[in-house]
C-alpha cells in the first residue's frame, strides 16, 4: 500500500521504494544512497524539519548495513505530527552514504555514532571520527561479523 508521502515522491519523480507502515502508522521508505541527498532536501521542503533520530544496524552477517532516519514534520498547531521512517541500505564492503548534517544539524553525533559502531562512512560529514570508542580501536563493534579482541587496554587519562 502506498502512503501519502510515497505518492508525493512518485508524483515528483523521486526514486524510492515503499516498505509499508509500522504499528503506529508511520510510513517507511527505502531510498538508494545516491538519491538520499536530493530526497532529503525534498523532504525538508515538504515540511520534515526535525530529525528525531538516526541509527544504523547490520542486516545480516555478510549482508548489507542500514542507516535509518526518523523524520518529523513539526509546526505550531500539530497535535499529532506527521512522521516518516527512511531506510538507506549499503553494501558492507563500501558502506557510503551522503551526510545530511547540512540539512538537519541533529545528524552530527548520530552519524558519528553509526560510523563508530558500524563503519558507515557519511560522505561530506565535517567531523567524521570515533565518538564512543578510542581512536585506536580496530573494527566496528556492532557488526554481526565483528570478532572482539581477547584483551584491550584502555589508557587512564590521569
Swiss-Prot record:
Cellular location(s): Plastid, Chloroplast thylakoid membrane
GO cellular component: chloroplast thylakoid membrane
A GO MF label: NADH dehydrogenase (ubiquinone) activity
Any Pfam family: Complex1_30kDa
Protein name in the entry: NAD(P)H-quinone oxidoreductase subunit J, chloroplastic
Family note: Belongs to the complex I 30 kDa subunit family.
SUPFAM superfamilies: Nqo5-like
GO biological process, one term: photosynthesis, light reaction
EC class: translocase
Species: Cryptomeria japonica
Top-level taxonomy: Eukaryota, Viridiplantae, Streptophyta, Embryophyta, Tracheophyta
Reactions performed catalytically: a plastoquinone + NADH + (n+1) H(+)(in) = a plastoquinol + NAD(+) + n H(+)(out); a plastoquinone + NADPH + (n+1) H(+)(in) = a plastoquinol + NADP(+) + n H(+)(out)
EC number(s) on file: 7.1.1.-
Subunit structure: NDH is composed of at least 16 different subunits, 5 of which are encoded in the nucleus.
Stated role: NDH shuttles electrons from NAD(P)H:plastoquinone, via FMN and iron-sulfur (Fe-S) centers, to quinones in the photosynthetic chain and possibly in a chloroplast respiratory chain. The immediate electron acceptor for the enzyme in this species is believed to be plastoquinone. Couples the redox reaction to proton translocation, and thus conserves the redox energy in a proton gradient.
InterPro entries reported for this sequence: NADH_DH_suC, NADH_quin_OxRdtase_su_C/D-like, NADH_UbQ_OxRdtase_30kDa_su, NADH_UbQ_OxRdtase_CS
Alphabetic keyword roster: Chloroplast, Membrane, NAD, NADP, Plastid, Plastoquinone, Quinone, Thylakoid, Translocase, Transport
Amino acid at each position: 500500500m502506498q502512503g501519502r508521502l510515497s505518492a508525493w515522491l512518485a508524483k515528483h519523480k523521486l526514486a524510492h521504494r515503499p516498505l509499508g507502515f509500522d504499528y503506529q502508522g508511520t510510513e517507511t521508505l527505502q531510498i538508494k544512497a545516491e538519491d538520499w541527498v536530493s530526497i532529503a532536501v525534498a523532504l525538508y521542503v515538504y515540511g520534515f524539519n526535525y530529525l528525531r533520530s538516526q541509527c544504523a544496524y547490520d542486516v545480516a552477517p555478510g549482508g548489507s548495513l542500514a542507516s535509518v532516519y526518523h523524520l518529523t514534520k513539526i509546526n505550531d498547531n500539530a497535535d499529532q505530527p506527521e512522521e516518516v521512517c527512511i531506510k538507506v541500505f549499503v553494501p558492507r564492503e563500501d558502506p557510503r552514504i551522503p551526510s545530511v548534517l547540512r540539512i538537519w544539524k541533529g545528524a552530527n553525533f548520530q552519524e558519528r555514532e553509526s560510523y563508530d559502531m558500524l563503519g558507515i562512512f557519511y560522505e561530506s560529514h565535517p567531523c567524521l571520527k570515533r565518538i564512543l570508542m578510542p581512536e585506536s580501536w580496530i573494527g566496528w563493534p556492532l557488526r554481526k561479523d565483528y570478532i572482539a579482541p581477547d584483551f584491550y587496554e584502555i589508557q587512564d587519562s590521569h
